[in-house]
Amino acid sequence: MTTAIVLDIEGTTSPTGAVREDLYGYTRARLPEWLARHRDDAAAPILAATRELAGRPDADTDEVARILREWLGSDVKAEPLKEAQGLICHEGFATGALHGEFFPDVPPALRAWHAAGHRLCVYSSGSLRNQRDWFAHARGGELGSLISAHFDLTTAGPKREAGSYRRIAEALGVEAGQLLFLSDHADELDAAVAAGWSAVGVHRPGEPNPPRPPHRWIGSFDELDLARTPVS
């Protein structure tokens, strides 16, 4: 019996374009000014970590901004970039400049699954702060109260490694066989299954990642009949 459902975001609950155009675009436009404004407080560890990772110990804030923008454009999963993006976008969510965008079937499905007793969690490459803001500031009504746990690359590990899913199961205190993972990435589904989870692929029109065997694939959360099975 499935007791917990773990959700990917990009391509699964939300359009990839919305995540990258909204969050990435907002971050890219504000990086230089934000780094300069917060160089002595919130940005200080980000500046230091970026200089170390890039091998540029003497880089000024403008050069660090260029490095972070290059990483953003290449979708590099670097911790200082994720931290900067989380802090910058948090300001955007707080002011109403940003909202979480979801496929139309997602909010009602999440509410139904939650009402039926399923525990809902998120596992994404986005920072924990961005994840929470994305759901809390969902367009059309907040969804954050439905989510009981968030995991990212720092707290769980790489999404294509089985060990990451074992760590999530341990953190949740749930047996692997009671966990269901929903993602649009076949390699991530492979890793979840290798860790003993159930996994279902989500392939939506216009999304870039193709489905492949041996996984079951759906085009909408409506195709999962989990809400009819209350969890004891």
Swiss-Prot record:
Query: What keywords are assigned to this protein?
Result: Amino-acid biosynthesis, Hydrolase, Magnesium, Metal-binding, Methionine biosynthesis
Pathway entry: Amino-acid biosynthesis; L-methionine biosynthesis via salvage pathway; L-methionine from S-methyl-5-thio-alpha-D-ribose 1-phosphate: step 3/6; Amino-acid biosynthesis; L-methionine biosynthesis via salvage pathway; L-methionine from S-methyl-5-thio-alpha-D-ribose 1-phosphate: step 4/6
For this protein, what does the record note about how its cofactor is bound?
Binds 1 Mg(2+) ion per subunit.
Q: Which cofactor does it need?
A: Mg(2+)
One Pfam family, short name please? Hydrolase
* Catalytic activity, reaction form: 5-methylsulfanyl-2,3-dioxopentyl phosphate + H2O = 1,2-dihydroxy-5-(methylsulfanyl)pent-1-en-3-one + phosphate
PANTHER family in the record, alphabetically? ENOLASE-PHOSPHATASE E1 (PTHR20371:SF1)
Tell me, how does this one assemble? Monomer.
* Function description: Bifunctional enzyme that catalyzes the enolization of 2,3-diketo-5-methylthiopentyl-1-phosphate (DK-MTP-1-P) into the intermediate 2-hydroxy-3-keto-5-methylthiopentenyl-1-phosphate (HK-MTPenyl-1-P), which is then dephosphorylated to form the acireductone 1,2-dihydroxy-3-keto-5-methylthiopentene (DHK-MTPene).
Q: Which family does it belong to?
A: Belongs to the HAD-like hydrolase superfamily. MasA/MtnC family.
The name this protein goes by in its record: Enolase-phosphatase E1
| Taxonomic placement | Bacteria, Bacillati, Actinomycetota, Actinomycetes, Mycobacteriales
